[in-house]
Regions:
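Short loop/turn segments that connect beta-strands within beta-propeller blades
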Residues: 14-16, 53-56, 93-98, 146-149, ...
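Hydrophobic beta-strand positions that form the internal "hydrophobic ladder"
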Residues: 2, 39, 78-79, 122-125, ...
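Non-cytosolic head/periplasmic domains of membrane-anchored proteins
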Residues: 19-128
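Acidic, serine/threonine- and glycine-rich low-complexity intrinsically disordered segments
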Residues: 104-106, 110-226, 232
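Structural motif
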Residues: 8-11, 47-51, 87-92, 133-145, ...
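Intrinsically disordered, low-complexity segments enriched in Gly and acidic/Ser/Thr residues
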Residues: 190-285
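A short beta-strand motif characteristic of beta-propeller blades
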Residues: 16-24, 56-62, 99-106, 152-162, ...
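Repeated scaffold domains used in trafficking and secretory/extracellular systems
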Residues: 26-37, 65-74, 109-117, 160-174, ...
Length: 315
């Protein structure tokens, strides 16, 4: 299935376009997070967040402070970063919307949180904080543990890693024990069962334009404008091994994994590429397309535009 949302509400559809449920709300700036069968939508800079599963709404959290970011786990727990002027709070909410944890961070001590990610099992969280030290910009990547292990640690912090002169703008748990941090010129792969360890460091020479993930792969679209095709696509596995390095010229708007393939799409076309860089499909659309979604079935995709939903099957 897939989700559609706006300032007025959110709906969940089967892949054939049938509405399963819809929920109305009023938000100025809604943002959605999805993990497995769980969905969260929050009003960024507002104070409300809803959690859903494929059957409908399961909870609502009302915060006393503006929401900066929302994340949801596979079991429906929500993590929200809240703004309190000179401090921030990372709150965890149960599926029913009740607050179960709260971690306070300060701008003067920890820095400003630019990205967070919760593990699918909701037991761990990675956050990236940016701070200025003299003339230098520094990023700290911090791990929190919300299981029994974290109870004995200050603010549940179980590890931290420093990046000098690098902004780490993207952090992501790709499964329960692996997390990735992407900086301007570096990709770090961390392993965390209870405490984190840095497993692999990958240096990136070109400017990173887009990062995308699956539970097996890390994909980067890089600027390649100085040599041939305008873009370079590189893919790494969780062991830090490069499994794809190719260039392309498609003016993509969306890029994502579908198993061991990569989908690149824009309003008028859709390209499917395997991990050898071979194009398996190149399809043009008559009407502008909003998105192309994998269905979980090999070679079957849902095409969404403003007027209809269509299922396509590749030969």
């Amino acid at each position: 299935g897939y989700v559609r949302y706006s300032n007025d509400g959110i709906s969940y559809y089967k892949s054939n376009g049938k509405v399963i449920w819809n929920q109305t709300y009023s938000m100025q700036n809604p943002k959605v997070s999805i993990c497995g069968n769980s969905i969260a939508v929050a009003d960024i800079n507002g104070s409300s967040a809803y959690s859903f599963n494929t059957s409908g709404q399961v909870g609502k959290a009302d915060t006393s402070m503006p929401i900066l970011q929302i994340e949801v786990s596979d079991n429906g727990k929500m993590a929200a970063v809240l703004d309190d002027n000179n401090a921030n709070y990372i709150n965890m909410y149960d599926t029913n919307g009740e607050k179960i944890y709260s971690v306070k961070t300060t701008l003067s001590g920890d820095g400003y949180p630019i990205d967070v990610s919760i593990s699918p099992d909701a037991k761990k969280l990675i956050a990236s904080f940016i701070r200025v030290s003299g003339d230098e910009i520094k990023t700290d990547v911090v791990f929190y543990n919300f299981s029994d292990v974290g109870k004995n640690e200050t603010e549940r912090v179980v590890g931290g890693f420093n990046y000098d002169d690098v902004i780490v703008g993207d952090v992501k748990f790709i499964n329960d024990t692996m997390a990735v941090a992407v900086g301007e010129n570096v990709v770090s792969i961390y392993k965390i069962k209870e405490y984190p360890s840095l497993e692999h460091t990958i240096k990136i020479d070109n400017e990173i334009e887009r990062v995308f993930y699956s539970d097996q792969y890390i994909g980067l679209v890089l600027d390649n404008s100085e040599s041939g095709d305008p873009y370079k696509l590189v893919v790494y596995n969780t062991s830090g091994k490069q499994v794809l390095d190719t260039t392309f010229s498609i003016q993509y708007t969306n890029v994502q994994f579908d198993g061991k393939s990569v989908i690149m799409s824009n309003a008028s076309s859709f390209v499917l590429m395997n991990m050898r860089g071979k194009q398996l499909a190149d399809i043009s659309f008559d009407m502008p397309v909003i998105d192309v979604l994998p269905t979980g079935s090999r070679g079957v995709y849902t095409v969404v535009n403003s007027k209809y939903i269509q299922s396509i099957k590749l030969k």
